[in-house]
Amino acid sequence: MKNQAHPIVVVKRRRHKPHGGGAHGSWKIAYADFMTAMMAFFLVMWLISISSPKELIQIAEYFRTPLATAVTGGNRIANSESPIPGGGDDYTQQQGEVEKQPNIDELKKRMEQSRLNKLRGDLDQLIESDPKLRALRPHLKIDLVQEGLRIQIIDSQNRPMFKTGSAEVEPYMRDILRAIAPVLNGIPNRISLAGHTDDFPYANGEKGYSNWELSADRANASRRELVAGGLDNGKVLRVVGMAATMRLSDRGPDDAINRRISLLVLNKQAEQAILHENAESQNEPVSVLQQPAAAPPASVPTSPKAEPR
């Protein structure tokens, strides 16, 4: 018995390969997270779609509120009526809406001012690019005034813009007017034309024909040249003759610089003022301003004979 050999027991330990189910289960977690996020997203979108503008403002106000104020329930900004603690400005109040609302009229004025400034730049560029107009630059005065953009074509002793004592346009005046016409036609603003003369009495022509008629005829002749250059005839709102009533120079009423054509690109306010002068309401006409007594017709000077302009 003692010599009997004990049986040898061999234990084989097999390594169990992991099944694929454990690795494949991770996508379920990611998918569940994705579905949760999508559900939250669509829930937020649905809440936004059914909320009123007032509720949306209050929600936005809540998220702008400092955390400490929201938690402690401190004083709310501007004593808002928002039901959310710590709310900010109450945009639902009428007074607040008036303060926050932009001034539409002021924005329109700024846009119009910007358009007129651009027009001024375009005209300067046009003059510099054309040798003929560049040579006539001393006869052009462009500036911004309260009524809009003013373009003045000024006469000179050596180079008049019109025939002496006549409304016949000189060739270089025609070049200026026809060159700027397309530029003026490219903006919505309307135009006022005014003719000016010096203080010399008009000596030629029919009796009663004075600097008033001459300045008006020259302004109308300028209008015709603008239309011939491509300007829409409907853009001209007014053509007037001012005679020698508005001097441009302090050097004297007979200075050649006072003989000019003033072309005014009107802003909206100036245009409405001109239209209001001749407008009529449905019930009664607009009150007419009292006109001064008519001056006697200008007599033809006898001695010495005045120089025609």
From Swiss-Prot:
The chain crosses the membrane at residues 29-50. Residues 1-28 are cytoplasmic. The keyword Transmembrane applies. Residues 149-269 form the OmpA-like domain. It is found in: Cell inner membrane. SUPFAM superfamilies: OmpA-like (SSF103088). Residues 276-309 are annotated as: Disordered. The keyword Manganese does not apply. Its main location: membrane. InterPro entries: Bact_OuterMem_StrucFunc, MotB-like_N_dom, OmpA-like, OmpA-like_sf. One of its GO terms (biological process) is bacterial-type flagellum-dependent cell motility. It is a single-pass type II membrane protein. Keywords: Cell inner membrane, Cell membrane, Chemotaxis, Flagellar rotation, Membrane, Transmembrane, Transmembrane helix. GO terms for cellular component: bacterial-type flagellum stator complex. Pfam families: MotB_plug (PF13677), OmpA (PF00691). Residues 300-309 have a biased composition (Low complexity). MotA and MotB comprise the stator element of the flagellar motor complex. Required for the rotation of the flagellar motor. Might be a linker that fastens the torque-generating machinery to the cell wall. Belongs to the MotB family. Each stator complex is composed of 4 MotA and 2 MotB subunits. 2 A subunits and 1 B subunit are thought to form a single ion channel, so that each stator complex contains two channels. This is Motility protein B. It comes from Salmonella typhimurium (strain LT2 / SGSC1412 / ATCC 700720).
